[in-house]
Each structure stands twice: as C-alpha cells, then as structure tokens.
Amino acid sequence: MVPVVALVGRPNVGKSTLFNRLTRTRDALVADFPGLTRDRKYGRAEIEGREFICIDTGGIDGTEDGVETRMAEQSLLAIEEADVVLFMVDARAGLMPADEAIAKHLRSREKPTFLVANKIDGLDPDQAVVDFYSLGLGEIYPIAASHGRGVLSLLEHVLLPWMEDLAPQEEVDEDAEYWAQFEAEENGEEEEEDDFDPQSLPIKLAIVGRPNVGKSTLTNRILGEERVVVYDMPGTTRDSIYIPMERDGREYVLIDTAGVRKRGKITDAVEKFSVIKTLQAIEDANVVMLVIDAREGISDQDLSLLGFILNSGRSLVIVVNKWDGLSQEVKEQVKETLDFRLGFIDFARVHFISALHGSGVGNLFESVREAYDSSTRRVGTSMLTRIMTMAVEDHQPPLVRGRRVKLKYAHAGGYNPPIVVIHGNQVKDLPDSYKRYLMNYFRKSLDVMGSPIRIQFKEGENPYANKRNTLTPTQMRKRKRLMKHIKKNK
C-alpha cells in the first residue's frame, strides 16, 4: 500500500509551498469532490525510489470552541487516514492559540507526527522555535520551504527512516524480472530463460469513481453476491479491501474502495468518499475501472480522477453506469458528450452498463484482460527498432536548425505502462507533434489497447563536446607553411 503523508497546520504557514517542493509540482491533482474544500491538493512524491501520496489538507482554524468543531471534515478525514502527519507552524508569527488547539487534537490521535517550523529564513532557527516546544510534540525541524532550506534534511532524517520502517525496500517489484532481462541485453549478456509470466500473476483491479456512481453495486454484481459493506471494526476505515476472485479461469484481486465504512458516522458524501483510499487503490492496481454516472455525465471530478490515473500510468477501462432506462435520444447525447470531453483518451475501451441489472457487466473483463496483456507484453529491441524505422520512412522527422533529426534505435524501457526508449541525435528538439506521431505509430503497430504508452528520448553523447581541437601532424605542417607565407608577404 502506498503510504500517505498529510501536511497540517493553520492557513498561510507554507503547506502548499512544501507540497509543491515535495511533489515537484508534477502529478499534482486539484480535487473538488463533494465535501472537499475547493483546491484541496493531492500529489505523488518519492524519496529514493519510494513513492508516497502527499496531501495539502488546507488551513485549519482552532478556536475556543474546540478544533474538532472548526476543522473542515475532509481535513479531519485526511489526518485519520494518513500514515504520518507533518504539523507545520509559522516561525515568524510565533506560537498561536490555533497551533495549540491543532497540537492537542494531533496528540489525541496518536499518529506519527513531526513538528515542522517554516519560514526560518533570516532568523536564528534555535531561537525561533523555542516557544513551539511547549506543544509537546518532541523535536522541531526548521525549514524555509520557499527556498528549499532544510527540506532535504527533513526528507532524509524524518520521512525516509519512517518509510523504511513502513515499507521495506526488500519487496520485489513485479516487473523486476523485466528490468533484469533488459539490463542483461544492454550489457551484451546472453538472455537467460526465466519462468516469469505475467499471466501467472493475478490482475489487480481497482474500481474507482465519485460517490453514488454505482461502485458498490458493480462490485457486488462482479462478485455475484451481496457483500456487507458496513463494518464496525477498528482500523477498517483506512485500508481498502483486497478480494481474491476467479473469472473464466483467470485470477483477479479486486481492490474495493467503496465497501469499508464506520457505522453511524455516514452523514454526507464526504464520509462516503475517501480520496486517499482511491488514490492508493490506483497506485496499487494493474488495471483501473473508472465508473461514470450516465445520468450526470462527465464532471470536473471525473476528469481530475482521470488525470491521476493517466499520470500513474495505469491501464484503464471506462465504465458508464446507469445506462438502463435512458431514452435513445439521451443516450446519443451522452455519447456525444463523452466523445467531446474524453477525446484525448483514445486508448481506453468504453462500456455502457447497468450494474443494478447486470447488463453489459460480463463484457468488462475482456477489456480488463486486454489492457493488462498490452501493458505487460514483452517486445524485443529489434522489433521496436524496426517499427521506429517504418515510422521514419512513412514520415520523416522535421529539420532542426537546418539538420535532419536522426533516430538510431529503440528498446524497451519498462512495462506497465509500456515505455519505449528512442536513441538518436537532436531528439530533444523534436516537436511535440512528431512525438505524438511516434507514440500513436507504436501503439498501432504493437496493438496496445487499454494501456497508455510512453516514449522517452535519449541523445548520444558527443565525445568531442567541451574538448579543444588538436591538429594532426599534417595539419601542423600545413599551418607552419601558411604562417611563413603570411609573414613573408607582410
């Protein structure tokens, strides 16, 4: 399971700045789900190869009425579901009553909490953080998030040791065998026979979507039984349920994000929908089913969730639920809207189903298997280079500064999603339009469906770069004769 780090604190203490610093602003997701404060941010970050989800919980105001009554419900939920909390305070503003109220709440939750004093630029860190020791949260880590000062130390001394304890790196990635074989080819070693077969592994399938789009109904329909979806057990509010199942002789692990709730606490949509749980399920899955409500159409929330799926590189099947009972005219309108708003997702299969009545559900697994097979298929260097050559013959790369970009060869750089690495000269200068052409050409030639495909470009290093030219003996003699001739004619 991908760990979760929550950034907590008063407004304007620098949570968003640290969030952007940790995620490097890539893969950031702005979510506007029901019950969530507008512009709540979720992003993917990593420390030395270990990925985690970072959450900017937004500002929390603690008052004399008690922090629990004033906190945004989603901020409280984020704290509950986080594995570790970075509690941020403003070193310039000093200790505030709201800080004390938040610290009191965090102490009661018994979460791993680290106190981070931000905005220490221009201050004596030791003197600036003295008052915050009264919060009773142990050691204080001074940083200046806007300039990056102290952030590396925070990562190395706080988050990294904690993540090593939570998720040891000994865990072997499913694709490790692929990388070992790839490195062997690169080093000119003979390809060893191995027993690794992606078909022997169960397909991890996550069903995600907004509240009330029919995820639970679809889960129950797939399993062929009514599952109890409300539990009253300690710890069941955080982790998704992993359900092994078999269909048509193929093993699956269904990641259920909709079925775990705490009894008596479901008051509105915010409790029924955990963004964190959904993002963790996406990261852990091989294939993601995105469920959309046909009666409500494509919302901004759907597009935000879709963006996270694409950035994660997961295979995708789009499921339009509640298709039954719609008139033919409405169905045509829904299809037009889908084509317009999802036109950029040309690789994913779209299914129109009724989870309640079961119509169309049986066809979903054919697309799931197709997407998984596409994302894990092995393709050799010779095949990829041949496809690249055919693409160049069909459409030459453009001229860059008067010279034609030369593509030399291609090889596999990874799987799930498939990555094609192309080597050549001036490849970094290729326009985006030609890069898209190559991506689509590889997709069509390899018959990749249901999975994104990524193209990476690498330039060969110029051995003479940054080196001074040296003349050959012949050139030296010619230069001497030329210099004598010039001096004689002066």
UniProtKB/Swiss-Prot annotation:
The lineage of its organism: Bacteria, Pseudomonadati, Pseudomonadota, Gammaproteobacteria, Enterobacterales. Residues 377-461 form the KH-like domain. Associates with the 50S ribosomal subunit. GTP 1 binds at residues 9-16, 56-60, 118-121. GO terms for molecular function: GTP binding; ribosome binding. SUPFAM superfamilies: P-loop containing nucleoside triphosphate hydrolases. NCBIfam families: GTPase_EngA (TIGR03594), small_GTP (TIGR00231). Belongs to the TRAFAC class TrmE-Era-EngA-EngB-Septin-like GTPase superfamily. EngA (Der) GTPase family. InterPro entries: G_ENGA, GTP-bd, GTPase_Der, KH_dom-like, KH_dom-like_a/b, P-loop_NTPase, Small_GTP-bd. CDD domains: EngA1, EngA2. GO terms for biological process: ribosome biogenesis. GTPase that plays an essential role in the late steps of ribosome biogenesis. This is GTPase Der. GTP 2 binds at residues 209-216, 256-260, 321-324. The keyword GTP-binding applies. Gene3D superfamilies: 3.30.300.20, P-loop containing nucleotide triphosphate hydrolases.
